[in-house]
């Protein structure tokens, strides 16, 4: 499983609840459910609240959402945190150090701590200073900000063009290596 942004939130949930997911790459995602409830069979995870008053608007009118969401570490939000310790395989967190959309580094560190507290050592984080939120395959153009439905303003994704491009190249190599190490021969595990 490879996923990015809100998709990484869903991808991490799938890793926790679906035994078929045996290796997971989460690119700038979260370790909990935000915005809308997550429903799977009889399970319903309520989202961690967001705080519109925490949205920051820069001089050009673009929105920074980095501090907009509630904190998964708060006791009242624990029911929304994914049980990453239940995942069936390793998890690789790819993090942009200049992510303006999510507090991705904190989310990844929280998930890794959770894995370790349950005796798991198969989680790993790769941090790319200067990379923004949308770390995609190499040579895709960097998107510093874009219009997003419902905001009525551009949303900042972050990233320095040179550092972001380098991160995309390096991250892609690491992702391919991760999947080669963890998926080759995994069909026999199902």
Predicted regions mapped to residue ranges:
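Loop/turn elements at helix/coil->beta-strand transitions in domains of secreted/extracellular proteins
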Residues: 19-23, 88-90, 121-123
């Amino acid at each position: 499983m490879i996923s990015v942004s809100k998709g990484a939130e869903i991808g991490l949930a799938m890793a926790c609840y679906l035994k078929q997911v045996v290796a997971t790459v989460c690119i700038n995602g979260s370790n909990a459910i935000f915005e809308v409830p997550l429903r799977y069979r009889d399970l319903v995870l309520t989202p961690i609240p967001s705080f519109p008053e925490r949205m920051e608007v820069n001089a050009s009118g673009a929105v920074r959402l980095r501090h907009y969401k509630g904190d998964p570490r708060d006791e009242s939000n624990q029911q929304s945190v994914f049980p990453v310790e239940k995942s069936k395989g390793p998890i690789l967190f790819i993090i942009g150090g200049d992510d303006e959309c999510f507090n991705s580094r904190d989310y990844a560190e929280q998930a890794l701590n959770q894995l370790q507290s349950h005796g798991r050592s198969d989680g790993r984080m790769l941090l790319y200073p200067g990379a923004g939120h949308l770390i995609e395959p190499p040579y895709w153009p960097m998107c510093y900000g874009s219009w997003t439905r419902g905001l009525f303003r551009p949303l900042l994704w972050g990233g320095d063009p040179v550092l972001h491009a380098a991160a995309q190249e390096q991250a892609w190599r690491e992702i391919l290596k991760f999947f080669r190490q963890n998926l080759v021969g995994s069909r026999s595990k199902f």
